[in-house]
Amino acid sequence: MDLFGDLPEPERSPRPAAGSGGPLLFDDLPPASSGDSGSLDTSLSEEVKNEGKGAKRKASDEEKNGSEELVEKKVCKASSVIFSLKGYVAERKGEREEMQDAHVILNDITAECQPPSALVTRVSYFAVFDGHGGIRASKFAAQNLHQNLIRKFPKGDGISVEKTVKRCLLDTFKHTDEEFLKQASSQKPAWKDGSTATCVLAVDNTLYIANLGDSRAILCRYNEESQKHAALSLSKEHNPTQYEERMRIQKAGGNVRDGRVLGVLEVSRSIGDGQYKRCGVTSVPDIRRCQLTPNDRFILLACDGLFKVFTPEEAVNFILSCLEDEKIQRREGKPTVDARYEAACNRLANKAVQRGSADNVTVMVVRIGL
């Protein structure tokens, strides 16, 4: 049985993009980012529990907590054209004493991952990390998460990439968290740092979005019918006030006060935060999958320092206005398109600080092109 064979085919647009050959907008995507895509939640453990002819796969406790959210009804065969991806970033310390955010841009790690050449043409990785209690957890995650991912990435022929990428991501997050907690607990006094993590792993034209905490990933997609760009949420925030998160925390013996774990921690999933792991805080990410289409313009990854003062729609429209600003021209030998994306990141980060965001601000924009 195909991993997603039980899912209905996506609806097709009556007016496909000329020469694209790729999948179009799937009908279960929200019209705009609502900030809570809970209605789209679908656990991969439910989808793969029957494998082969009636064989059952047992889901581990961690997999039950880490659900894969489908941003489309079925992963279609990718277009013969692989969309190019290129990341740009800007960061501001804001009013904080220390810059505790971290980020990683790896436009092409295909050679490092050594994927099955017959199945995968390109692998890319983009991530933002929002540290709290210090910079050590976010810095550690930025330095090690992708390295662990590369080591665990599916290799060799005769494997199903679709079936193994989620396990690869789950193992990567678990291993990275365990490594940091081991190092943190060996210190005197023990480190209490923690970090969110929002990662986009692109395997050809398929995005896998793994998220812990309240940093976010947003996709800008053009709607041909409305002739407008939509901001589509690719990640799910993890706050202790959410029902499932609160129930897990309480079941583990913790509690939620004033919207925080034990009245202190603002997020319910993170890397690090060793003192809260026994209280139900977990490093198991939510994993979503999204097929890129010819109508996709860019991906925005940002920490909550941006979204405290910008809605996703406002941020996407702000970036679009920068990309259409003809005053931004080629400079320092860089093409105009690069100059505009860099300006969009810098202007958006500056505007967030001007609007009063007291937090660190990290803005990453990933350009999607042919």
Curated annotation (Swiss-Prot):
Task: Name the enzyme group at the top EC level.
Answer: hydrolase
List the Gene Ontology MF annotations in alphabetical order. Answer: metal ion binding; protein serine/threonine phosphatase activity
Q: Known catalysed reaction(s)?
A: O-phospho-L-seryl-[protein] + H2O = L-seryl-[protein] + phosphate; O-phospho-L-threonyl-[protein] + H2O = L-threonyl-[protein] + phosphate
Give the GO cellular component terms, alphabetically. Answer: cytoplasm
Q: PTM Phosphoserine: at which residues?
A: S13
Q: Which SUPFAM superfamilies match?
A: PP2C-like (SSF81606)
Q: Which residues carry this modification: N-acetylmethionine?
A: M1
Q: Which residues form a coiled coil?
A: none
Q: Which residues carry this modification: N6-acetyllysine?
A: K188
Annotated region Disordered: the residues are 1-69
Known function: Protein phosphatase that may play a role in regulation of cell cycle progression via dephosphorylation of its substrates whose appropriate phosphorylation states might be crucial for cell proliferation. Selectively associates with integrin linked kinase (ILK), to modulate cell adhesion and growth factor signaling. Inhibits the ILK-GSK3B signaling axis and may play an important role in inhibiting oncogenic transformation.
Give the protein name, as stated in the record.
Integrin-linked kinase-associated serine/threonine phosphatase 2C
Q: Which organism is it from?
A: Bos taurus (Bovine)
Q: What taxonomic lineage is listed for the species of origin?
A: Eukaryota, Metazoa, Chordata, Craniata, Vertebrata
